[in-house]
Regions:
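Glycine-rich, phosphate-binding/catalytic loops in enzymes
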Residues: 42-47, 90-94, 287-293, 347-351
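Inter-lobe coupling linker of SF2 helicases/translocases
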Residues: 2, 6-25, 53-83, 94-241, ...
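Conserved Helicase C-terminal RecA-like lobe
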Residues: 164-338
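SF2 helicase motor core recognition
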Residues: 20, 35, 83-85, 317, ...
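Conserved ATPase-coupling elements of RecA-like P-loop NTPase cores
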Residues: 33-53, 85
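Conserved Walker A/P-loop ATP-binding site and its immediately adjacent core
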Residues: 80-87, 273-277
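Short glycine-/polar-rich loops that comprise or flank the Walker A/P-loop
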Residues: 22-23, 68-73, 87-90, 169-171, ...
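Walker B catalytic acidic pair
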Residues: 29-30
Length: 352
């Protein structure tokens, strides 16, 4: 507090450092949000590019580890490993770096050569038109030793050991046949992917620079457009005709069917969609389209809500209270905004 007041009074040096705050404990909930920590590797198939927030967290943790002998940071997460085996290395790097250093495993490739194994499998290529051999870091070695190192800093609780009350559920996969437009788009994307592999990509806009790659086609763009086309081609071009048997229409049919069957008990449903979110400048988005389709089928507008419209904790809690009571019966949101800290399960009957 004294450091803050001194800095406030001396406007010429108003910057407060993390050390000056006097922090000696750091609790990080949902710690998997900081899994993208950069590292150097020669292994293919790994995302070694870090996020700025993870680098910032590492700097703070390194300071706390130094002053607390690696006892000042507590992580809480249900998914310490979600997408990549390298995330386990990241957790060790955050919480037990001294152990990595003492074993000569602080650099990722040394850790990977001890605990990991590369495997080669056939998988569908990004364009979705063929297969290719892909080598990935996908299997653990020396598991007893790795487990022992992990348990030095991890207190692991499973759902079975906690005896969490998890309701029974059924999974239904809804199949949507590709439309003629979607098939045509996939063919175009496959051709673009082929040109990219041949180092002859198309220009995405006027003034594109082939030498620097700016404005030129790349696989990330192809994959993103492929995902959009698979959901609804209108994300790419709003002038495409609506498909009554497409994913959005089928979702509306299923949601309305459950809505009708559970009217008496006012059951609620949640719809997750990470693409084509509302409040964008695009002419078309899936959220507005789905709401319009539900309203056309008979769902009142006030019983449909977008989590994106509730941008403060207070607004979200008021929304969640309405969902728990069944006043709002259909809630749409993305995984980031609706997947964590959402207490709406009282009347929840289905998730789409």
């Amino acid at each position: 507090y004294a450091a803050i007041m001194d800095a406030y009074q001396n406007r010429q040096d108003a910057t407060i450092t993390f050390e000056q705050l006097g922090v000696d404990r750091l609790y990080v909930d949902e710690a998997h949000f900081y899994k993208n920590l950069s590292f150097t590797t020669k292994i293919q198939g790994l995302n070694a590019t870090g996020a700025e927030k993870s680098t910032d967290l590492l700097a703070k943790i390194q300071y706390l580890n130094e002053i607390t002998n690696e006892r000042g940071v507590i992580f809480a997460t249900g998914t310490p490993i979600s997408n990549s085996m390298a995330e386990l290395y990241t957790m060790q790097r955050y919480l037990r770096p001294s152990r990595l250093e003492s074993q000569g495993l602080y650099h990722f490739d040394a850790w990977a050569s001890t605990f990991g194994q590369e495997t080669t499998t056939m998988e569908i290529d990004p364009a979705g038109k063929g297969f290719r051999a892909k080598t990935r870091f996908a299997r653990f070695n020396n598991i007893p030793e790795l487990t022992s190192m992990f348990k030095e800093f991890a207190d692991v609780k499973t759902a079975e050991s906690l005896k969490l009350p998890v309701p029974a559920y059924d999974i239904e996969i809804v199949k949507a046949d590709a439309s003629a437009v979607q098939k045509e788009l996939v063919d175009r994307l496959a051709e673009r992917a082929k040109r990219i592999r041949q180092r002859n990509p198309i220009k995405l806009r006027e003034g594109a620079d082939p030498s620097s790659g700016k404005g030129m086609d790349n696989m990330l763009v192809v994959i993103k457009e492929g995902q959009s086309a698979a959901l609804n081609p209108r994300i790419l071009d709003a002038d495409y005709e609506d498909n009554p048997t497409g994913k959005v229409s089928l979702c509306a049919d299923n949601v309305y069917d459950i809505y009708q069957k559970t009217t008496v008990q006012k059951s609620t449903q949640v719809i997750f969609c990470d693409q084509s979110t509302p409040n964008s400048k695009a002419q078309y988005n899936v959220y507005d389209d789905l709401r319009e389709k539900l309203m056309e089928r008979g769902v009142p507008k006030e019983q449909i809500a977008f989590i994106h419209d509730y941008d403060t904790p207070e607004k979200k809690e008021r929304l969640f209270a309405k969902v728990r009571k069944g006043d709002v019966r259909i809630l749409l949101g993305s995984s980031d905004k609706l997947g964590v800290g959402t207490n709406i399960q009282n009347k929840l009957i289905a998730s789409h």
